[in-house]
Amino acid sequence: MTLYDNWADIYDIVYSYVRDDIQFYVERAQQCEGPVLELGCGTGRVTIPVAAAGCEIVGIDNSVAMLDMAKQKAANAGVQPVLELGDMRDFALDRQFSLVIIPFRSFLGLMAVEDQIAALDRIKCHLAPGGKLIFSAFVPELHRLGDDEDSTYHLRDLTDPQTGSRSVLSQQTAVDSYNQVIAVRLSLEQLDFKGEVVRKSYHEYEMRYAYRYELDHLLARCGFEVVDLYGSFDSEEFGPESGEMIWVAKVL
């Protein structure tokens, strides 16, 4: 069982606000001449729109429950992406891809440098000649990370589109600046029609944040050349005010 197995049934509700990257990945998939591989595909948030756009896509995730949800959603959408259980650090597929994507900061879930290198090595082996890797990471802002440390704050109110049930999502973070690790604890309170809490669930995970030139060096060390670095999913050039790093790289 992985961290996300117990979170699969509410993952899409919790992260329903994350939509600004979908069209970006769909367009990049349409532009490439060949199949697409998504690592950390989860419930198919990006996989299914890419497949619906007519692109051949394979999705890999290490959570059985998340993949089951993705398969159900794909069937409902009338698309047939290939969805497989696997780990981005050691996956081995008997084929190559024109594009490999790692959306929504999933690369930051690799907590050790050795894991990052292993994943990039696997990606390099699965990229066809001229193929590209695209992944995203947030820009670490130390003053903001410090403000959030050990505090609990309200993120958003949620409504299940199928049942109409309401929930309140809160987040607590702890920052280890020495190891560049953020520990996140999400709390989901599900409410009845009176607004009283009837169920409370938690989800904890860690991310190892990384800086621009740290990732630049990591890619170079692993045999990649940076083609583009965007600061938003509108393909704006990365700059001082950017909150995202969207990396586009190819094998040297």
Spans of features found by a protein language model:
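Conserved class I S-adenosyl-L-methionine
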Residues: 1-42
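Class I SAM-dependent methyltransferase SAM/SAH-binding core
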Residues: 47-90
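A short acidic, Gly/Pro-enriched loop at the edge of an enzyme's catalytic core
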Residues: 89-99
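A short SAM/SAH-binding and catalytic strip from SAM-dependent methyltransferases
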Residues: 98-114
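A short glycine-rich, Lys/Arg-flanked "PGG" loop and its adjoining helix->strand segment in the class I
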Residues: 117-129
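SAM-dependent methyltransferase
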Residues: 134-216
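C-terminal lobe and adjacent flexible extensions of AdoMet/dcAdoMet transferase-like proteins
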Residues: 206-252
